[in-house]
Amino acid sequence: MTKKLTAAVIGVGMIGRLHAMAYWQNARTALVGVVDADFEKAKSVAQEFETRAYRSLAELISSEHPEVLSIAVREDVRYEIAIEAAKSGANLLLEKPLAPNLAEADSLLDEIEKISLNKKHTVNFVLRADQRYAEIKQRIDQGALGEICTVFARRRGTSAGADIYGPWTNLLISTAIHDLDAIMWTTGATIERVYAESVVKKCAQWNHEDAVVATLKLSNGAIATLETSWVLPPNYHSPLEAQFDVVGTGGNARITGSNQGVEIFSESGYLLPELSSWPIHQGKLSGALRNSIDNFIDCVYFDRMPLITLTEARNAQSVVAALQESLKTGQATNVDLRKRIDK
């Protein structure tokens, strides 16, 4: 049997644990360790997926020398960890966003490029691995929709999102960034100018927004509308309400919801289960997250380009920065796009 890639995960909260599960279940990887600031959590995940728990990244690197590393810690504590991981020579899969702000994202990319430009580094934008969005991109690339004129992207969560994520991140950088990247990726255009308005309620205590609606001007002449919020009540029938709609001179493509057509009616109420991102059935992880991690493994294994480069991830974050500037000034804002070398 061909040698497996050794893999490890730094940060095993909700998403990091799923990274560990994906490596454990992939036939091309051997999960050799996990790290978390909460060592008891690390031990629990290690036991679940038959690997070893480490107290620090340095200890993990020294003992295991992993070839691929998922970095799933919060973006506000990621910088030094990512640099240390890059210096180890591993190929990196970073959770999105790259950093809490654009300046730190640029600095991180500069450092990673100096250290290990020849490695396969990528960022986990799961919509690129969602077959529904990939289908729309393919149709656009084939010209089936003609010239793209408008795009509408919606991503609504409940107010539980504000409670969980509000103290350390914000709606635009954690949630809207998915759709910003999806708009650019599917259409093959960049977002050049933005104008945004917001509603601030519960998130006022953390100095950011509960809801944002924005107009985006694309480099191909199209106009996009973004709607995102953490407003719906916690008992809402769907944990995530997403929509993506593209209109062109030759047709229309549309994604509605994330429940894959499944509706549940029971004594407890009505539910649209989230079945697109990371569903688990019979102990097996599937969905866009599994696809994204499997793609990263294949990129390293077969020497292919990743689904998203660090530059593209950075440019999605640059749109977030422009939206934040527009909210602050009340004016339309140009997006600071940069070209970088990604190999």
Positions of the model-derived regions?
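A contiguous active-site-proximal alpha/beta segment in oxidoreductase catalytic domains
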Residues: 99-161
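Beta-strand-loop-alpha-helix segment that lines the small-molecule cofactor/substrate pocket
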Residues: 63, 67-68, 74-75, 79-125
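N-terminal Rossmann-like dinucleotide-binding module
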Residues: 1-49
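Hydrophobic residues in well-ordered beta-strands that form the structural core
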Residues: 55, 93-94, 121-123, 152, ...
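Conserved SAM-binding strand-loop segment of SAM-dependent methyltransferases
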Residues: 51-57
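Mid-domain beta-loop-alpha active-site segment that forms a flexible
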Residues: 124-131, 159-195, 207-210, 312-313
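Contiguous beta-strand/loop segments that form the cofactor/metal-binding neighborhood of enzyme cores
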Residues: 180-260, 290-302, 340-343
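C-terminal helix-rich "cap/oligomerization" subdomain common to oxidoreductases
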Residues: 1, 68-70, 118, 295-343
